[in-house]
Amino acid sequence: MTQPGELVLKACACLVDARGHLLVFRHPGDESMQLPKGTVEPGETPHDAVRRELLEESGIRFDGPLESLGTLDRFCPAGGVEGTRIAHPQLWHLYLMRSVDALPETFEHVAIGSPQEHGLRFAFRWLAPDAPLDGFLLPYQQAIVRARAAV
């Protein structure tokens, strides 16, 4: 359980296809647009966590190389779609993942894993390199800008 002021590590997947489009989804909890992301579990590395989170949230297994896009600092207020009751700082580890598999243009996946998201239906689509970032909260916008610069 998160303690007040305790830093929580997160891993964020920036999966791009051959066109440079980025995999994003609409979160049904608040209708915001997001990237696959989640908490690094005890004993887990951010590298392992980003692969697990992508699989849990999208159903996509990614075994390819990870390219670090650095980290982002974020303060997470209590409440919201993350289901936290305690405000806390977060450190997001961002990874670029280049898909070599053909994936559908749009698809839905029922999330597994965390109690807050288990059973939620996420609607995925690909975000074009020049698409506006309306609907994304600031940390996701920052992650997308980094991913776009690296592609």
Placement of each model-derived feature along the sequence:
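Short hydrophobic/aromatic beta-strand or adjacent loop that forms the aromatic wall/cage
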Residues: 8-12, 90-94, 121
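A short, polar/proline- and glycine-enriched secondary-structure boundary/capping micro-motif
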Residues: 33-37, 116-118
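N-terminal strand-loop-strand
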Residues: 1-35
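Active-site-adjacent beta-strand/loop module that shapes the phosphate/pyrophosphate-binding cleft
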Residues: 74-111, 125, 130, 143-148
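The catalytic Nudix box helix
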Residues: 35-71
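Short, cationic low-complexity segments
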Residues: 115-126
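Short, charged/polar surface micro-motifs in flexible loops or helix N-caps
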Residues: 16-22, 30, 41-42, 74-77, ...
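A generic structural signal for short beta-strands and their flanking turns/coil linkers
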Residues: 29-31, 62-64, 70, 89-93
